[in-house]
């Protein structure tokens, strides 16, 4: 009998009933909620006269709709209603939360790891497609719909069919100026946004082992853009060092670590599909089109039109085949989102812009992903570096990642963004989004267009 992958081991731990290949009832260890996908689920509970079965395993955040300038000045009626309703619901149902304006407030996929609620071995769900972020800790984590949110509220369980397994192995050592965001964008550009459909993706390899937890979260975060709702990594000493001392980790932390060490994939584990990518061959990535697979490295011209999707993307973006990333006239820079708004992301960007000024006629904003990150950044003076360079330093939230709050890119304007999606109108009606690493976004803010960060002395 072959060995088991980490996913197999975690799945087996959480099956309550059901046969493999059929829907199985799974126990949920941690349920994260936010203001957008929870109101109808709470109302369903209320209508049925039910309670939240395990409020102690549920945690709420306020992130998608919150303004990042005056955080309580919510002018959109729907956004305000969703914020107010979550505030009411967490009180009514006895759910702990990082309340709007609190010291812990932030994006759900930031707050979970920061508080230590996200742990190896857990089965984690949230009504948000980027829940795979938490898989970087060695957890099964994925997004669910509102009806499933209600089901978890009521039962602390979820019916799921076990997916196939894919191994993505990142090998080699990257050049300077190449980051984990480039790894995942390069993977998606090469294999497409549907490659991971029906699979859980396990990321591993020497290039993963060298990454910090914050860098690993960036890769797992964009599993959904690769087509997979689940991404997972094996926990290791880097994981345990990140978690030690956080608020919600197990009291007997060493005993927990001993258990977590048994969860890693066996050497003879088998996979349904295997992909290998040598990161030493990568260059900085930038997307040119309207889905994350429409990306090229800095050295490569935009491709010829291959189908109607390309034709539509070029028309929407106002670009043409043969151009290069440096030809894009940028008007906005966004450094933030659950993909790249952690302290290390901000430190990287600050090193590049320190002592410089952003390009004239360009708007650049930095949005820390959580209030703890904002405080930590301000403690070491990052806010001053950004403001001196001409950036706007904002309050935490999802911000310009999506057009669901006041932070929007104007119609027709190109934005270098550290977020995860570049769909039509994603950052505002007519907004033209280019996904990239924090280093590429910061350097572009100074130049007014994309530049090769490998050539910058500030980049390590």
UniProtKB/Swiss-Prot annotation:
EC numbers, comma separated: 4.2.1.33
Reported cofactor(s): [4Fe-4S] cluster
Biological or metabolic pathway of the protein: Amino-acid biosynthesis; L-leucine biosynthesis; L-leucine from 3-methyl-2-oxobutanoate: step 2/4
Transmembrane segments: none
UniProt: [4Fe-4S] cluster binding residues: 338, 398, 401
SUPFAM superfamilies: Aconitase iron-sulfur domain (SSF53732)
Molecular function per GO: 3-isopropylmalate dehydratase activity; 4 iron, 4 sulfur cluster binding; metal ion binding
Gene Ontology biological process terms, A to Z: L-leucine biosynthetic process
Details of cofactor binding: Binds 1 [4Fe-4S] cluster per subunit.
Keywords of this entry: 4Fe-4S, Amino-acid biosynthesis, Branched-chain amino acid biosynthesis, Iron, Iron-sulfur, Leucine biosynthesis, Lyase, Metal-binding
Reactions accelerated catalytically: (2R,3S)-3-isopropylmalate = (2S)-2-isopropylmalate
UniProt keyword annotation of S-adenosyl-L-methionine present: no
Domain of life according to the entry: Bacteria
Top EC group: lyase
InterPro entries registered for this protein in UniProt: 3-IsopropMal_deHydase_lsu (IPR004430), Acnase/IPM_dHydase_lsu_aba_1/3 (IPR015931), Acoase/IPM_deHydtase_lsu_aba (IPR001030), Aconitase_4Fe-4S_BS (IPR018136), Aconitase_4Fe-4S_dom (IPR036008), IPM_dehydratase_rel_enz (IPR050067), IPMI_cat (IPR033941)
NCBIfam families named in the record: leuC, PRK05478.1, PRK12466.1
Function of the protein: Catalyzes the isomerization between 2-isopropylmalate and 3-isopropylmalate, via the formation of 2-isopropylmaleate.
Family of the protein in this entry: Belongs to the aconitase/IPM isomerase family. LeuC type 1 subfamily.
SUBUNIT field: Heterodimer of LeuC and LeuD.
The name this protein goes by in its record: 3-isopropylmalate dehydratase large subunit
């Amino acid at each position: 009998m072959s060995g088991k992958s980490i996913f197999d081991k975690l799945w087996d731990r959480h099956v309550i009933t059901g046969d493999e290949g059929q829907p199985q009832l799974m126990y949920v260890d941690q349920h994260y909620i936010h203001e957008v996908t929870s109101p109808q689920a709470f109302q369903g509970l209320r209508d049925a006269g039910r309670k939240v079965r395990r409020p102690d395993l549920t945690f709420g955040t306020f992130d998608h709709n919150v303004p990042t300038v005056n955080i309580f000045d919510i002018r959109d009626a729907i956004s305000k209603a969703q914020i107010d309703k979550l505030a009411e619901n967490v009180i009514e149902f006895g759910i702990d939360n990082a309340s709007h304006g609190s010291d812990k407030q932030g994006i759900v996929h930031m707050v979970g790891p920061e508080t230590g609620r996200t742990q190896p071995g857990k089965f984690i769900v949230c009504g948000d497609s980027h829940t795979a972020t938490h898989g970087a800790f060695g957890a099964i984590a994925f997004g669910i719909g509102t009806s499933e949110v209600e089901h978890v509220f009521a039962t602390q369980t979820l019916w799921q069919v076990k997916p196939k397994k894919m191994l993505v192995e990142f090998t080699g050592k990257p050049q300077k100026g190449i980051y984990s965001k480039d790894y995942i964008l390069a993977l998606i550009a090469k294999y497409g946004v549907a490659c991971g459909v029906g699979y859980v993706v396990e990321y591993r390899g020497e290039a993963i082992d060298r990454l910090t937890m914050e860098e690993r979260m960036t890769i797992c975060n964009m599993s959904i853009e690769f087509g997979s709702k689940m991404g997972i990594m094996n926990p290791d000493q880097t994981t345990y060092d990140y978690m030690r001392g956080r608020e919600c980790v197990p009291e007997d932390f060493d005993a927990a670590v001993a258990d977590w060490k048994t969860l890693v994939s066996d050497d003879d584990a088998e996979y349904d599909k295997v992909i290998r990518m040598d990161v030493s061959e990568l260059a900085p990535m930038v997307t040119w089109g309207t889905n994350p697979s429409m990306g090229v490295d800095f050295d490569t011209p935009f491709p010829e039109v291959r189908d109607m999707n390309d034709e539509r993307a070029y028309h929407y973006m106002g670009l043409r085949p043969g151009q290069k990333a440096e030809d894009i006239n940028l008007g906005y820079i966004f450094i933030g989102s659950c993909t790249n708004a952690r302290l290390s992301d901000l430190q990287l960007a600050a090193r590049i812009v320190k002592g410089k000024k952003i390009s004239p006629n360009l708007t650049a904003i930095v949005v820390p992903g959580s209030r703890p990150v904002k405080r930590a950044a301000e403690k070491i003076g990052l806010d001053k570096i950004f403001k001196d360079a001409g950036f706007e330093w904002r309050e935490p939230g999802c911000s310009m990642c999506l057009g669901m709050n006041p932070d929007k890119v104007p119609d027709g304007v190109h934005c270098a963004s550290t977020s995860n999606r570049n769909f039509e109108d994603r950052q505002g009606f007519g907004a033209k989004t280019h996904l990239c690493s924090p280093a590429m976004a910061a350097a572009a803010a100074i130049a007014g267009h994309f530049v090769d960060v490998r050539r910058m002395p500030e980049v390590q």
